[in-house]
C-alpha cells in the first residue's frame, strides 16, 4: 500500500530530566537498558527546559504546561508568570480594568472581596507575589472586607513550607488594618483535575459556607494543627480561620471572587463548580450569585466569566501547520497529561485541528501514583504501538506521565519503578517505529524524577527541577545532533525531519541535521 504513512513519533517522558549525580536520582539508579543503549548509540543532545529558555523568569523550574506550549509553538512563549511579574513591576496590574471594576463594584455595594488561589512561591500554578499585589489593589481601592482563601502547595514547593507564606500575608493584613486569611486547604482538594468531585466538594463548602472539618484562630495555628495530624501542605484538610468575634467569611450574593491561579488545568474544576448553572459534579448546598467572578487568565473557552488577562493567540503552531499541509496527526496520553498534548501543545486551542485524532487513556483511580507507579502505561503503549503500525498518521505525539506524576509523590522507590516501566514501554515503541520505517524523537518537558530528595532540607523533593532534558533520535535518516537547544527547537526539528518548510513564526532551530 503506497499510501501507508511512515510516522514521525514524538514521545514526551514527563518529568524525565538529566542529572549526572547518582544520589537520590531515580532515573540514573533505575535499570534502564533500553534508554542506556539509545543514549550510547543514537544521535542525542541535551536541551534546556526551564527559565528564560521557555519564557519563564531566570532560574524558574520548567513545568508541563509551559513545556508543551513551547514544544508545540516552535518559539519561546512568554508565560503568564513572566507576563504578570512584568505587569506588577511596571504598575499596569493595578489599573487592570477587569480587576479594578470588580473591586470597585464590591466597594460601591458594600460587599466583600474574596481572593482565592495557590499561596505558593512555586510559580507553576500561581505566585504569592501576584496574590499580594491583588490584596494591595483591593485595599488601595477601598475594599474593607478582604478575605484570602489560601490553597496550600507542598508539591511545587517543599512538602511543609507554607508557614512563611501564611506569616507574610498575616503581617500584610495587620499592616493594612483590614482583611484576613479566611481559610486554608491543601491543593489536593481545591485543585483536583481528575473529576474527583468528593475532594472538590470539601473545598467548595469551605469557601462558600465557611464550613470545614477544622477551625483555628489564625492561619499558622491551623497549619500547625494539620502538621500535628500528619498532613503536609498539599493535603491540609479544610480549615476555617476565624478568631472569636470575627465575622464569618462565607461567600454571599453580590460579593466579588477573584481566582488568582494563572495556570488553567487545575483551576477549571473548582471554577466550573462556582459558575456553571448546569453543574452536576455534586449537589451544591449553596450557589452564590457573585457580583463579579474573575479568572486571572482564561481557564477554558467555555467558562463564561470575566478574565483579567486573556490569552495572546499563537499562529502556526506545529499542529496548525500540519493541518495547513494536509498531514494527519494523533495525540495520545493518559488523563493526567491529556490536556498537555492537546490544549497546551496547540497553544491554548481546545478544538482539534482538521486531521488531528486524539486518544485518551484513563489514569488509574488511586489516591497518589506511588501506589501504582506504572499508571496506565501498558494500555497507552498498546494503543500507541497500534497507531504507529496503522499507516494512518504522519505524526504521533505521546506523553507518558509517570516520571512526573510519581516524582511528585516524593517516593523514591516508586519513582524508580515508574522509570523502569517506561524503559519497557520505550522498547516497544522503538520496535514499532522501526517496523513502520518511521522516525522517533524521545524527549521530556522538564525534570523531576532525577532529583527525589532536597539536599538543602533533607525533605523529599516533590517539585520539578531546572535541569536539562534528553533528546534522542531513532530512525531511517543519518543525522547529526546540534548542541545548545531548547524545547522550542523541537517543532522545527520535526518539520525538518519531515522535509517540510518551517513557518516564519517558528524561531526555533532544527537540532538534528540530516547528513
From Swiss-Prot:
List the catalytic residues.
64 (phosphoserine intermediate)
Q: Which Pfam families match?
A: iPGM_N (PF06415), Metalloenzyme (PF01676)
- Residues involved in Mn(2+) 2 binding: 14, 64, 445-446
Recorded GO molecular functions are: manganese ion binding; phosphoglycerate mutase activity
Known EC number: 5.4.2.12
Listed A to Z, the keywords are: Glycolysis, Isomerase, Manganese, Metal-binding
Instruction: Give cofactor(s), names only.
Output: Mn(2+)
Residues that coordinate or bind Mn(2+) 1: 404, 408, 464
Q: What class of enzyme is it?
A: isomerase
Where along this sequence does the record place binding of substrate? Answer: 125, 155-156, 187, 193, 263-266, 337
Listed under catalytic activity are: (2R)-2-phosphoglycerate = (2R)-3-phosphoglycerate
Query: Which InterPro entries does the UniProt entry name for this protein?
Result: Alkaline_phosphatase_core_sf, BPG-indep_PGM_N, Metalloenzyme, PGAM_B_sf, Pgm_bpd_ind
- GO terms under biological process: glucose catabolic process; glycolytic process
Residue ranges annotated as coiled coil are: none
Cofactor binding, per record: Binds 2 manganese ions per subunit.
Copy the pathway line from the protein's UniProt record: Carbohydrate degradation; glycolysis; pyruvate from D-glyceraldehyde 3-phosphate: step 3/5
Q: Does Nucleotide-binding show up as a keyword for this record?
A: no
CC terms in the record's Gene Ontology section? cytosol
Say which family it is in. Belongs to the BPG-independent phosphoglycerate mutase family.
Subunit structure, per the record? Monomer.
Annotated function: Catalyzes the interconversion of 2-phosphoglycerate and 3-phosphoglycerate.
Protein name according to UniProt: 2,3-bisphosphoglycerate-independent phosphoglycerate mutase
Amino acid at each position: 500500500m503506497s499510501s501507508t504513512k511512515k510516522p514521525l513519533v514524538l514521545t514526551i517522558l514527563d518529568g524525565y530530566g538529566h542529572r549526572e549525580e547518582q544520589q537520590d536520582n531515580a532515573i540514573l539508579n533505575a535499570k534502564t537498558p533500553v534508554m542506556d543503549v539509545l543514549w550510547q548509540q543514537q544521535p542525542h543532545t541535551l536541551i534546556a527546559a526551564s527559565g528564560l529558555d521557555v519564557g519563564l523568569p531566570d532560574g524558574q523550574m520548567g513545568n508541563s504546561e509551559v513545556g508543551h506550549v513551547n514544544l508545540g509553538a516552535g518559539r519561546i512563549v512568554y508565560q503568564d508568570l513572566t507576563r504578570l511579574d512584568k505587569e506588577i513591576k511596571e504598575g499596569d496590574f493595578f489599573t487592570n480594568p477587569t480587576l479594578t471594576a470588580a473591586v470597585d463594584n464590591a466597594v460601591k455595594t458594600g460587599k466583600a472581596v474574596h481572593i482565592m488561589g495557590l499561596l505558593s512561591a512555586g510559580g507553576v500554578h500561581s505566585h504569592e507575589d501576584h496574590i499580594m499585589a491583588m490584596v494591595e489593589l483591593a485595599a488601595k481601592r477601598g475594599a474593607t472586607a478582604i478575605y484570602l482563601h489560601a490553597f496550600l502547595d507542598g508539591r511545587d514547593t517543599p512538602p511543609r513550607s507554607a508557614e512563611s507564606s501564611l506569616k507574610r500575608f498575616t503581617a500584610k493584613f495587620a499592616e493594612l488594618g483590614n482583611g484576613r486569611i479566611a481559610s486554608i486547604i491543601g491543593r489536593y482538594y481545591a485543585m483536583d483535575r481528575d473529576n474527583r468531585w468528593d475532594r472538590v466538594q470539601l473545598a467548595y463548602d469551605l469557601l462558600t459556607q465557611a464550613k470545614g472539618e477544622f477551625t483555628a484562630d489564625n492561619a499558622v495555628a491551623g497549619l500547625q494543627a494539620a502538621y500535628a495530624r500528619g498532613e503536609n501542605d498539599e493535603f491540609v484538610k479544610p480549615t476555617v480561620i476565624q478568631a472569636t468575634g470575627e465575622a464569618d467569611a462565607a461567600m454571599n450574593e453580590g460579593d466579588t471572587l477573584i481566582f488568582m491561579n494563572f495556570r488553567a488545568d487545575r483551576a477549571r474544576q473548582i471554577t466550573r463548580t462556582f459558575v456553571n448553572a448546569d453543574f452536576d459534579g455534586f449537589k451544591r448546598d449553596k450557589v452564590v450569585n457573585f457580583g463579579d467572578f474573575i479568572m486571572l487568565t482564561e481557564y477554558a473557552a467555555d467558562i463564561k466569566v470575566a478574565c483579567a488577562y486573556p490569552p495572546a493567540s499563537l499562529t502556526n503552531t506545529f499542529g496548525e501547520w500540519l493541518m495547513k499541509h494536509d498531514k494527519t496527526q494523533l495525540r495520545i496520553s493518559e488523563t493526567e497529561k491529556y490536556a498537555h498534548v492537546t490544549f497546551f501543545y496547540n497553544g491554548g486551542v481546545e478544538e482539534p485541528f482538521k486531521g488531528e485524532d486524539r486518544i485518551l487513556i484513563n489514569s488509574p483511580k488511586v489516591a497518589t501514583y506511588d501506589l501504582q507507579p506504572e499508571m496506565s502505561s501498558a494500555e497507552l503503549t498498546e494503543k500507541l504501538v497500534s497507531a504507529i503500525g496503522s499507516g494512518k498518521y504522519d505524526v504521533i505525539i505521546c506523553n507518558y506521565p509517570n516520571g512526573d506524576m510519581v516524582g511528585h509523590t516524593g517516593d523514591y522507590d516508586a519513582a524508580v519503578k515508574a522509570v523502569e516501566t517506561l524503559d519497557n514501554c520505550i522498547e516497544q515503541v522503538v520496535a514499532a517505529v522501526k517496523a513502520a520505517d518511521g522516525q522517533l524523537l524521545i524527549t521530556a518537558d522538564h525534570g523531576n524524577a532525577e532529583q527525589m530528595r532536597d539536599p538543602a532540607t533533607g525533605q523529599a523533593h516533590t517539585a520539578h527541577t531546572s535541569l536539562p532534558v534528553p533528546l534522542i533520535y531513532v530512525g531511517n535518516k543519518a543525522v547529526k545532533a546540534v548542541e545548545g537547544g531548547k524545547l522550542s527547537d523541537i517543532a522545527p526539528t520535526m518539520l525538518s525531519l519531515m522535509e517540510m518548510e518551517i513557518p516564519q513564526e517558528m524561531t526555533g532551530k532544527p537540532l538534528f541535521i540530516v547528513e
